[in-house]
Amino acid sequence: MKAYDFTQGNVLKQLVLFSMPIMLGNALQVSFQFIDSLWIGNLLGAKALGAAAVSSTIVLTVLSFILGLNNATLTILSQQKGKDDIKGMASYINAFVVLLTGLSIGFGAAGFFLSELLLRLLKTPESMIPLAETYLQIQFIGILFLFGYNFISTVLRALGDSKTPLRFIAFAVVLNTVLAPLFISVFRMGIAGAAYSTILSQGIAFLYGLFYVIKHKLVPFSIPRMPKWEESALILKLGIPAGLQMMVITGGMMAIMSVVNSYGDHVVSGFGAVQRLDSIITLPAMAAGTAVNSMAGQNIGIGNEKRVGTIARLGVIAVISCMLVIAVMIWVFGKYLIRLFISEPDAVAFGEQYLKWIAFFYPFIGVNFVLNGIVRAAGAMLQVLVLNLISFWVLRYPFTALFSAWLGQKGIGLGIGMSFLFSSCAAFLYYRYGRWKAMKLFTEK
């Protein structure tokens, strides 16, 4: 597969061609979770689905920290790729492998033995705990596969290859789609079968990916050895704030749910439906953010500030154009999209109302993803953490509470939409006037 050298060539063409496989990969990740829920809900019932959902929340919280380390991977390796420092790339990849293996063992063991305690801390209904504990313990047994599966994709994207990871993700989705009903119903393993199907699919995809990249020499892997202290320190320096960003987002959404929950079942159901749509609507923006991170990282690595500016400018134009088209589609077809998930009239009415309020604010969240991706490429992870704190806790939650208190349930969409607008303004101000351009991850020898 082709790996892009983002330090030369047509920026817009590279942005589109590189981000499309990332968007498809993210869509497949969403479908992985959707298909899993579909089989569990239909074959095992609502209680099993609830148990799996609670367990998945815990696993995703742990994964969010690891995704932070993956963002550090993307930034560090993109800059090394830009400098064409193969030895440096190999050394940092080794450090990531050692850290991820250690964290996998630590998180896996702790999660396995603390599963019941974690579920009780989340106030899981007593009737669900046995099912949830079974599902969660199996997930923690296979957490190395989950980490590794995401890690290989991130490394390849950092090196300019977004197509090869799509192969592994698609393989895992197809495998899970086949294995889940087989393990649940044919082998009569129940919810344990669903969990084993997930980790087996991810495990085989991880091993397939590892074999593929080694065979085709796509990544400079080596026999693992103890990394240098400065390498581990840099990874953690960037990775911990990036991991906390994900937790800030999760916590912010939980706070917003407290506002939504106060309006009754029909609003909660309608909001749940629009959140499912939201995970699809924002796929292009997320893909653009990941793409510009890799593209800008390579150019920051060689000090090409002018091209970084071009990437930012064209990235913003492209994402606004794309999200405006999506906004029009949401405005016109929102009611029908909501009905894919729910049929209760009051819930559908709220969902349609929400989408009409928020539709034309979506381009601003695209701007946010792109500009944060640019500054993240320079290693400004702590600064992006602060921007996310502003976005979710200074803007989104207060605006949602304020506008809903003023306008009732229709104020929820307006409040969240206004937070998109002001968050993008904050991101632009830091991009324009912040000191991220002066950051240096590596000292010249």
From Swiss-Prot:
What membrane topology does the annotation report for this chain? Answer: Multi-pass membrane protein
Question: Sorted alphabetically, which InterPro entries does this protein's record hold?
Answer: MATE_fam, MdtK-like, Membrane_Transporter-Flippase
Q: Name where it mostly resides.
A: membrane
Q: Which stretches are transmembrane?
A: 15-35, 49-69, 95-115, 136-156, 168-188, 194-214, 240-260, 277-297, 314-334, 355-375, 384-404, 411-431
Report the locations given in the UniProt record.
Cell membrane
Any GO molecular function:
antiporter activity
Q: Which residues form the signal peptide?
A: none
Record carries keyword Nucleus: no
Lineage, top-rank taxon, reads: Bacteria
UniProt keywords (A-Z) are: Antiport, Cell membrane, Ion transport, Membrane, Transmembrane, Transmembrane helix, Transport
Its cellular-component GO annotations read: plasma membrane
| Any one of the GO BP annotations | monoatomic ion transport
Q: Which NCBIfam families match?
A: matE
Membership in a protein family: Belongs to the multi antimicrobial extrusion (MATE) (TC 2.A.66.1) family.
The name under which this protein is listed is Probable multidrug resistance protein YpnP
Q: State the species of origin.
A: Bacillus subtilis (strain 168)
- Gene name of the record: ypnP
